[in-house]
Amino acid sequence: MKARNSDIEKAADVLRAGGLVAFPTETVYGLGANAEDPAAVARVFQVKGRPPSHPLIIHIGGAEHLADWVEEVPATARLLAERFWPGPLTLVLRRGRRVPLEATGGLDTVAVRVPDHPVALTLLSAFGGGVAAPSANRFGSVSPTTADHVRVELGDAVNFVLDGGPCEVGVESTIVDATGEIPSVLRPGGVTREDLEAVLGFPITVPSTSHVRVPGQHPSHYAPRAWVVLVEPEKIITEAELAQELGHQVGVFLPPSLADAPVKAHAVVAVPSSMAAYARGLYGFLRELDRRGCDLIVASLPAEEGLGLAIANRIRRAAGPRPSK
C-alpha cells in the first residue's frame, strides 16, 4: 500500500470538487468520480472516450450501504453480498433514486460493488459516498493493473492518481444480474461461476452474448495495439513462425504444455500454469508485448472453467473485430 493517508485525503477532496481520481482495486485500477455528480460522471466518459450508453460500476464502502443505491435488495443479492464483499463481485439491481442516469447508461438498473483493496476502502470511507468508476484506461484498450499504466495512458486527464501497487486479481469483477429470481452472470471475472453456485446451491447461466447493460461487453475490448489471433494450442508455434516469416513482429502466449518448446518469434510470454497467476499477469503481458513492438499476438484460450472462464473472455474480446478508423 504505497498511498499515504494524506494522499487519500487529497483524493477524497478531488472527488468532492468534481474531479477524477484513479485508484487501485483488487481487480484493476478504476477511474473514479463522485457517483452523485452528473457532470463529474460525464467527464469520466469524456476522458475514456466511452460511449454514454455503457454503464459504470458504483463502488461503495460496505454491504451495509447497498440499500442506499438500489430500489430493493433481493434475498439472493443479500446472500451474495454477505459472502463475496469486499471482493471482485458486482451486483446489478434496480436503480435507486439517488443514482443519476448518467452513471447507468440510461438504464433502470445499477451496478454496485465493494472493492477488496485497503486504498480503495480507505478512499471510500474518507469520501463518504459512492464512486462511479470504470477501468482507468481509454475505452476498449487493455485495462491497467498498476498506477504507471494509468499515468502512461491517461496522463494529465486524471486529477489525482493513488498508487496502491499491482492489482492482486488482475481481471475485472464478475457481474451478476440479481434483478430476477434466478441470477445470471453477465460478465465472468474474479469470482468464478463455481464459487457462485456453491453459495447459491443451484446452477447459474453465463450467456454467450450480452446487450451493453454492463461494462466490457463490446465485441472488441481489453485490446492491445497489436492484433490478437486465436489458434488451438498445438498450432501456436506453427502459426507464430509462419507470421514471423511473413514479416510480422510476433508475440506469442506460449501455454504451459509447450513451455520448453523453442519458437522463432519477436517476443514470447510463458503463460503460467496457475489460473490465478495468469489472470494477475494477463493485462501486463499484453502491454509488454505492445511495448516490445509486436504487431501480432498469437494465443490460445485456456479451459473455460474457474478463473479460466474470465481469462478466455478477455482474450476472446481482445481478438474481437475492431471498429474501422
Segments the model singles out, each with a brief description of its role:
Residues 1-325:
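Active-site-adjacent structural elements in enzyme catalytic cores
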